[in-house]
Amino acid sequence: MIFTLQRYIFRELLKVFVPTVLALTAILSLGSILRPIQEYGVGPRQVMHLMLYFLPITLTFVLPMAALFAGALVYGRLAGDNELDACRASGVSLATVVYPGLALAIVVAICNLILGFHIMPVFVHLAEKSLKADAKQILFRNVQRKPYYELPPDGRYLIYADYANPQNNTLSGVVVTEVKNNRIEKIITAQSAKVTFNPSELFNEVQITAYKTDQMGAEDQVWFYAEWLSVTAEFGSLLTDDIKFKKIDEMKRIRSDLTQFYPIAKLSREAYAQFTTELLAQDITAKIADKTENVYKLYSGEKMVEFTAGSASVGDKKIELSGDIRVVERDAAASAGAGRDRCTLRTTKDGKALLYLDGDELAPTLTMDIYNARVEETGDLRMRYIIRGLIVPETVETITTQLQTQNGDLVVEKLISPAFGKVLEKGSSPELTSLKNKLRRIIQKTLAQIKAEIHSRLVFGIGCVSMIMIGIALGIIKKGGHVLSAFGASCVPAAVLIVCIMSGKHIAENLGSQNISGIVLMWAGLAFLSLLAAGIYHRLLKY
């Protein structure tokens, strides 16, 4: 008899719970895809896919609210129809009648924890893959709508175009602007450009091959015209580079190896490249200051470059050579007494040379870019001469490899340590100091976010039980009122818990505060809700 009664109550709960879940999910799912539609310009075909992928995020909030509504409504009706009084008169205790509601609350709490820690991040990654697969359409659609597009995630490159043709992947009347630190680094204008995407696991690489181009740089850069020019940029993550979209095992991996989190890995590689540049600049400065032999040598597989310069100054991942610059490019065999000199260049009064890292930051090559130089053999003036594929000197590589593990991964902690920075005799440049400080902040923030995210998911999942049980109790207490009055009253303690979670999470993630206070606030909200539920049921069971 008791099992039949409980099954009846549970069935009544499901009759309200399931339609409520479906209705709320449909409404909130439509709201959840508005941002991707507005920001990324996804097409109609992808809208249904995104609704499916964002479903676990929606269910995380819908399931507790639907169970709260069902519990307050069903038990309020049972109490209003005196069915609970009939059960008591038959010797069935209130605790026995409440068991179906408790079972639903526990099921919802377990589902919420599984959704938050495991399922929701997987579906967000699927949504990310879906958006990446449609990256070309997103770019062209945004250019057609605005008519410009900022390449995510940092908006470093802005692409403007008068006309976009997605059928043959071309843009007409193109302007590509590179912005760094709120400063325009360069502007490239082109008659037309072809856009291609090279997909990878972490990001898509966008290659823009421009035709009839003019490049305008900052004050210290040379302006020039080129028939063809290729620009490669990163089309980064749209959704997943956020701790709140990580699974529990991913967060644990990030905590043990910080380079598993792409924003940290990317910034650490930039800092590593800047550190390598400054080490190279230090080595060049020491060599060209040597009065006995002031020639600096760089090698590649097939050639060798020797150069002298008046001075070498370090910049943002580049070294600027100035003064009287003389560059000799020769076959590698020439250094052994065979072969021949390929070219000897000497800069004019307005000339200069740049030496910068190219390719993979962890295993880079060097490129020398020489401006306004005259060929000694012929007297011809070269406005620009580029030598690529030079190898980082062994003196520099010996030090930089100490920052890598045997697998080639960066040791971030060593990179940002003050002790290792003493290798640079003149200290770190403002660029390297800024990168290190930024890296320290993002590491601290990431670790704080991981801690706050884990605790917030736990508190909200466990709190679902107390939240739903309070709704059931208030439904019984307010049996003489409106059917929705109990639901409205039970939303108040639920709102208190949510406010405590959001406030605690914000405090825990704030680097200027003690994050333990935010964690305590979250669990204090759960303790308040649990004590309130215990007090209400103590009163109900007593009478």
List each model region and its residues.
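Transmembrane alpha-helices
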Residues: 1-188, 194-347, 354-369, 374-543
